[in-house]
Swiss-Prot record:
Protein name: NADH-ubiquinone oxidoreductase 75 kDa subunit, mitochondrial
Phylogenetic placement of the source organism: Eukaryota, Metazoa, Chordata, Craniata, Vertebrata
Organism: Bos taurus (Bovine)
Cofactor: [2Fe-2S] cluster; [4Fe-4S] cluster
Listed PANTHER family: NADH-UBIQUINONE OXIDOREDUCTASE 75 KDA SUBUNIT, MITOCHONDRIAL, RESPIRATORY NITRATE REDUCTASE
Function: Core subunit of the mitochondrial membrane respiratory chain NADH dehydrogenase (Complex I) which catalyzes electron transfer from NADH through the respiratory chain, using ubiquinone as an electron acceptor. Essential for catalysing the entry and efficient transfer of electrons within complex I. Plays a key role in the assembly and stability of complex I and participates in the association of complex I with ubiquinol-cytochrome reductase complex (Complex III) to form supercomplexes.
EC number: 7.1.1.2
Domain of life: Eukaryota
Length: 727
């Protein structure tokens, strides 16, 4: 069953979306021949005229058509002539027929496009000099290429009242050409039916009908797909032109998905963040936190080293003084008297440098803020803590069981993949945990973790659904593993996954077991041998503690001896810095070339877009300098040498943009039998239940005024956020 209209689903197929609809193997053998301006091309039945033209490299103008959305056919800019046909046809919506000769540059085609463009420009305001879309506007480009050189319109232009849909998207609806891309994105990709049209003909308007915030974690993507300047970025308004900015390809670290992004900078400042195409991860979308939290990069920053004086106050100092103090304390302790905690935004290079430094003083107490059970297989088997099916792999699944997670806010782009498969492939989804709005229908099996034992034993009705599935996925949220019975939950999920693999029709290379992480540094830290959670530090408090970007509040001053010497190294004055005796300012992800590993085990690199503010430096360089002053010099001086060291410890960390398949599920299941199987009666409640919990989850987003406005708008309404009254 298709959950979108059949005609729209078939006509809207493109290279990027064909894989998500199951087709018969005979389709490829039934190719038909058509001609584009006399040039022969072989295409599959159902291919549209527009797709056939693109196959031979002929670009057809369009406004409403988008490769990842259903076909609307309402802008008519893609009109082309078919030889011997009485009228021009809309190329985006018309399937080709055998023997057709498509004329893309005939006089009839040119006249039709010119007429459509004239109608579109009739009511369009001459805002180009003050429009934020200027320089990357489809209407500008296509009016130059396909429009007339003069206007015949003398009547008054219509004006439309702007809509307030929140603090992120700025609307100037007089510029709207009713292409409905934003409406289709909202309903099909984001799964939120907040946008629609009212009125008809000249009175048609796009909006929310009643004034309200556009309640979606993916709302910023409508800015990218809007072909005109009707929808632009509020935080970016009137700040820069696209040709003034320098573009740097990088990745996002706001969650564990690792979305590919482009960082636009000017004069050493991040001006905006845009999505970058990566079919296996984020396609061409990014979350609102990824897109709009960049203003947090210039607020609450640590720009100079600081030390705590005799009065207990933190004061500025030099790098030499700060590092000398830390080195002196480091030389005073040995073994587990020295410990470290790594936060959620730390890169792999800093993790290996800190590990090597503490190993020099015979300490192996290196912990992460996130807990992951070490009982049973624990972190010894890499497949035990990865999203093994991969992010794109969910499009092949036929059943998904979500356990203790809300992927909509923990991993928005992964949730969009699930919705895509649910929409096109008849994917069946079930959830164990608190009921949440996932933007697609699912079976709520309850919120008790004991349901896992019923499914494993076969006594639960959903057990049969899993047994009959050909490609099932069990996805366990990392938030569920923070509980006291996290080990038992992991063991139960591992047991279910292994039983499905061995007793149903699952193919040998299909991976059932999946862990969905929430933070960017966790997989790399586990790969490098960090201990998940701070239990070891709480049981045996150290005399010296390194907090490497640790702002999760997992440990407080009260948990440590009064004389414990705390060093905080990071880029924001958030939770960790105020309790430190020495603060070492580090670089944020836009200010360094660094390695991060996403939840599926894919290593990727951030790139230097701007220089760190003030005296801040890259984390691994700070640790390397500290080691030299302390007389225990680490054996690397360059970034390449650090990455060679990464390769020695864990080769996966330098196999960039590659996912290595792991298949140790049977061993993990056997080892899980050694775990205490006792489950608590407490319900599984993910920490991010609503969109209000999505916006401020790390030191960067908590420093962002834009994210604070989003929380206020969600809580009090879009009208509660005052915006400057300019254009």
């Amino acid at each position: 069953m298709l959950r979108i209209p059949v005609r729209k689903a078939l006509v809207g197929l493109s290279k990027s979306s064909k894989g998500c609809v199951r087709t018969t193997a005979t389709a490829a053998s039934n190719l038909i021949e058509v001609f584009v301006d006399g040039q022969s091309v072989m295409v599959e039945p159902g291919t549209t005229v527009l797709q056939a033209c693109e196959k031979v490299g002929m670009q057809i103008p369009r406004f409403c058509y988008h490769e990842r959305l259903s076909v609307a056919g309402n802008c008519r800019m893609c009109l082309v002539e078919i030889e011997k046909a009485p009228k021009v046809v809309a190329a985006c919506a018309m399937p080709v027929m055998k023997g057709w000769n498509i004329l893309t540059n005939s006089e009839k085609t040119k006249k039709a496009r010119e007429g459509v463009m004239e109608f579109l420009l009739a009511n369009h305001p001459l805002d180009c000099p003050i429009c934020d879309q200027g320089g990357e506007c489809d209407l500008q480009d296509q009016s130059m290429m396909f429009g007339s050189d003069r206007s015949r319109f003398l009547e008054g232009k219509r004006a439309v009242e702007d809509k307030n849909i929140g603090p992120l998207v700025k609307t100037i609806m007089t510029r709207c050409i009713q292409c409905t891309r934003c409406i289709r994105f909202a309903s099909e990709i984001a799964g939120v039916d907040d946008l629609g049209t009212t009125g008809r003909g000249n009175d048609m308007q796009v909006g929310t009908y009643i004034e309200k915030m556009f309640m979606s974690e993916l709302s910023g993507n409508i800015i990218d797909i809007c072909p005109v300047g009707a929808l632009t970025s509020k935080p970016y308004a009137f700040t820069a032109r696209p040709w003034e900015t320098r573009k740097t390809e990088s990745i996002d670290v706001m969650d564990a998905v690792g979305s590919n992004i482009v960082v636009s900078t000017r004069t050493g400042e991040v001006m905006r963040i845009l999505p970058r195409m990566h079919e296996d991860i984020n396609e061409e979308w990014i979350s609102d936190k990824t897109r709009f939290a960049y203003d947090g990069l210039k607020r609450q920053r640590l720009t100079e080293p600081m030390v705590r004086n005799e009065k207990g106050l933190l004061t500025h100092t030099t790098w030499e003084d700060a590092l000398s103090r830390v080195a002196g304390m480091l030389q005073s302790f040995q073994g587990n008297d020295v410990a470290a905690i790594a936060g959620g935004l730390v890169d792999a290079e800093a993790l290996i440098a800190l590990k090597d430094l503490l190993n020099r003083v015979d300490s192996d107490t290196l912990c992460t803020e996130e807990v992951f059970p070490t009982a049973g297989a624990g972190t010894d088997l890499r497949s035990n803590y990865l999203l093994n099916t991969t992010i794109a792999g969910v499009e092949e699944a036929d059943v998904v069981l979500l356990v203790g997670t809300n992927p909509r806010f923990e991993a928005p782009l992964f949730n969009a993949r699930i919705r895509k498969s649910w929409l096109h492939n008849d994917l069946k989804v079930a959830l164990i945990g608190s009921p949440v709005d996932l933007t697609y229908r699912y079976d709520h099996l309850g919120d008790s973790p004991k349901i896992l034992q019923d499914i494993a034993s076969g006594s639960h009705p959903f057990s049969q659904v899993l047994q009959e599935a050909k490609k099932p996925m069990v996805i366990l949220g990392s938030s569920a593993l923070q509980r006291n019975d996290g080990a038992a939950i992991l063991a139960a999920v591992s047991n279910i996954a292994q039983k499905i693999r061995t007793s149903s029709g699952v193919t040998g290379d299909w991976k059932v077991m999946n862990i969905l992480h929430r933070i960017a540094s966790q997989v790399a830290a586990l790969d490098l041998g960090y201990k998940p959670g701070v239990e070891a530090i709480q049981k045996n408090p150290p005399k010296m503690l390194f907090l490497l970007g640790a702002d999760g509040g997992c440990i407080t001053r009260q948990d440590l001896p009064k004389d414990c010497f705390i060093v905080y190294q990071g880029h924001h004055g958030d939770v960790g810095a105020p309790i430190a005796d020495v603060i070492l300012p580090g670089a944020a992800y836009t200010e360094k070339s660094a390695t991060y590993v996403n939840t599926e085990g894919r290593a990727q690199q951030t790139k230097v877009a701007v220089t760190p503010p003030g005296l801040a430096r890259e984390d691994w360089k700070i640790i390397r300098a500290l080691s030299e002053i302390a007389g225990m010099t680490l054996p690397y001086d360059t970034l390449d040498q650090v990455r060679n060291r990464l390769e020695e410890v864990s080769p996966n960390l330098v196999r960039y943009d590659d996912v290595e398949g792991a298949n140790y599920f049977q061993q993990a299941s056997e080892l899980s039998k050694l775990v205490n199987q006792q489950l608590l009666a407490d319900p599984l409640v993910p920490p991010q239940l609503t969109i209000k919990d999505f916006y401020m989850t790390d030191s960067i987003s908590r420093a962002s005024q834009t994210m604070a406005k989003c929380v206020k708008a969600v809580t009090e309404g879009a009208h509660a956020v005052e915006e400057p009254s300019i254009c």
